[in-house]
Design a protein with these regions (language model features):
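Alpha/beta-hydrolase active-site loop
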Residues: 44-65
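Catalytic histidine neighborhood in serine/cysteine hydrolases
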Residues: 242-257
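Short amphipathic alpha-helix adjacent to the substrate-entry channel of hydrolases
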Residues: 8-27
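Short beta-strand/loop motif that positions the catalytic acidic residue
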Residues: 214, 220-222, 226
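Short glycine-enriched nucleophile-adjacent loop
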Residues: 81-92
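Alpha/beta-hydrolase fold nucleophile elbow
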Residues: 66-78
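Accessory cap/linker subdomain of secreted extracellular hydrolases
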Residues: 100-210
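Conserved alpha/beta-hydrolase "acid-adjacent" motif
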Residues: 227-233
Length: 257
């Protein structure tokens, strides 16, 4: 699945599933937790939930006698792509992974890429664009660090980011483009803490340790001009990994889309 409360029979999933079925490939699609026929509660960006559900789906396939247990693969799109390597590694019984709109960089980099293009689409550019992205990166990185080490809260580094927020707000408080189209950073890091509680596992997520431990074929399919996924950064990492290891990586880029 991509991000959001998506059902098993949504248009993107249905198209891919039907294509695989026509080639004789059995497909298991499931509603996200808390969506459709699935139990539980859906939580945005709950990667820990999504990983556990994916592992359970693999275990279910392994319990069936009509499935070739040596040929079980994963196909993840966007958000599904970033967690697929962890599912494959922890389930210990996945033969291959296909990544559609693949993500091979950490979630902070992916979020910043998406926010950059959202702001460009709203007419934000130049120093205002660069300053806002830089500040968002500082906020994300400090909040992630604070979850790893609570002592970071109210540290000198924490207050430096607070000062950056104040400086940005003062610099652009009269900027009409930002007032109309920009996002609000609040007045201090503490204003972000409640929001961050709900997305901490997603913002701090990094698929690379799992990718690097996998020893199975992986296909990454990218759109050259994807505004949600940083194609160039992901491809650069994957090519370097392939060059310096024996990884079975196939990288495909669809041009001009």
């Amino acid at each position: 699945h991509g991000s959001g409360p998506l059902p098993a029979d949504g248009p993107p999933v249905r198209v891919i599933a039907n294509a695989l079925l026509k080639h004789g490939v059995a497909v298991l699609c499931y509603d996200k937790r808390g969506v459709g026929a699935s139990g539980g509660t859906f939580r945005h960006n709950a990667y820990d939930d999504f990983v556990e559900d994916g592992i359970n789906a693999v275990h279910y396939l392994n319990s069936r006698n009509d499935v070739d247990h040596k040929a079980i693969g994963l196909l993840g799109s966007s958000e599904g792509s970033i967690i697929a390597p962890e599912i494959a590694l922890r389930s210990k019984s996945v033969a291959f992974v296909i990544h559609r709109a693949g993500i091979a960089v950490d979630a902070i980099e992916c979020n910043l890429w998406e926010q950059r293009h959202e702001q460009i689409d709203r007419g934000i550019s130049g120093d205002l664009l660069e300053d806002s992205i830089r500040l968002q990166q500082l906020i994300f990185e400090m909040l992630v660090e604070s979850k790893k080490d609570p002592k970071t809260v109210e540290s000198e580094s924490w207050h430096q980011v607070d000062a950056e927020i104040v400086s940005f707000n003062q610099k652009y408080r009269s900027n009409e483009t930002w007032i109309k189209h920009g996002k609000r950073f609040g007045n201090k890091l503490a204003d972000w803490e409640r929001f961050f509680e709900g997305v901490a596992s997603a913002i701090a997520y990094d698929p690379q340790p799992f990718i690097e431990q996998l020893d199975i074929p992986m296909l990454y399919i990218f759109a050259e001009k994807d505004e949600n996924v940083p194609t160039s950064a992901s491809v650069k990492y994957l090519k370097s990994l392939k060059m310096n290891s024996s990884k079975q990586l196939d990288i495909r880029i669809i041009p001009d889309v």
